[in-house]
């Protein structure tokens, strides 16, 4: 029992020493960073319970306050998502930003738009094989039909 308590103490000190990761400084949105902090805090809270209690009922009793804290933390994180955005975030498609490629300088397409245009039309300018995924499925279906006829 003493070894177990020392292990719990050691892991608790280790968790405190490593501190919470700084998700907000990694370029994450505030809401996502808040949720990741909630998960980290929940894991750190549950570790001693996992080490101390082997029976399910005692473990659940031990973890119950941790789970309540996690739910409260998530509710607090919804506050960050509910705040109105004054500026569009980079990479988001707000109010017609998706059509920028069509309005490029001198009628040139942007890098990503060319690939999307080829994928939608199915016509490539390389002059290579024009075999599509549907052709492969048709060939495979023909083989299966022949196999069914041979089994009779």
Curated annotation (Swiss-Prot):
Tissue range of expression?
A: Prismatic layer of shell (at protein level). Expressed primarily in the mantle with highest level in the mantle edge and lower level in the mantle pallium.
Protein name per its UniProtKB record: Aspartate-rich protein
Q: State the disulfide connectivity.
A: none
Q: Which organism is it from?
A: Margaritifera margaritifera
Residue ranges annotated as compositionally biased, kind Basic and acidic residues, are: 82-113
Q: Where in the cell is it found?
A: Secreted
Q: What residue range is the signal peptide?
A: 1-19
Record flagged with keyword Signal: yes
Write out the biased-composition intervals (Acidic residues). 135-152
Q: Where is this region: Disordered?
A: 82-152
What UniProt keywords apply to this chain's record, in alphabetical order?
Secreted, Signal
Q: Does the keyword Ribosomal protein apply?
A: no
Give a GO cellular-component term: extracellular region
